[in-house]
Amino acid sequence: MPPPGPLKLHVGAGRARLEGWVNMDIQQIPGVDVVCDVTKGLGFDNAEAIFAEHFLEHLALADAVNFLQECHRVLRPGGWLRMSTPNLDWVWVTHYRLDVDDETKRMAALQINRAFHGWRHQFLWNRQMLNEALESCG
């Protein structure tokens, strides 16, 4: 049962519980209200807000687009979606330079992949790709 008041969904909550929100995660851990695989739907309608911080990058591209479409379906008119995700452009600019030797490039590539996979990231977004995906979802 959601808390009283407007429906607000916190997707990928983990241990970062938000009071007054429905805290959702794929794992049953303390503070999670609803355990679900959001790639199969959110299970709610008419939400005022959806918050997903450092979540989208953990989905494969097709699943992420489906999630964004589901957010559009679930949000009531005037509702809002707030997300944060690592910016691929920043990762590229800060970790990979074209004017360095091959060994430095190889080490940068290893560091990026270690960080990318070590945090179980599936797909990194830049602003342009995320904007295009959001616009295509409505």
Segments predicted by a language model, with ranges:
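Membrane-proximal basic amphipathic "stem/tether" segments
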Residues: M1-P3
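S-adenosyl-L-methionine-dependent methyltransferase catalytic module, highlighting the catalytic core
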Residues: L61-R76, W80-G138
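Conserved SAM-binding loop
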Residues: P6-V91
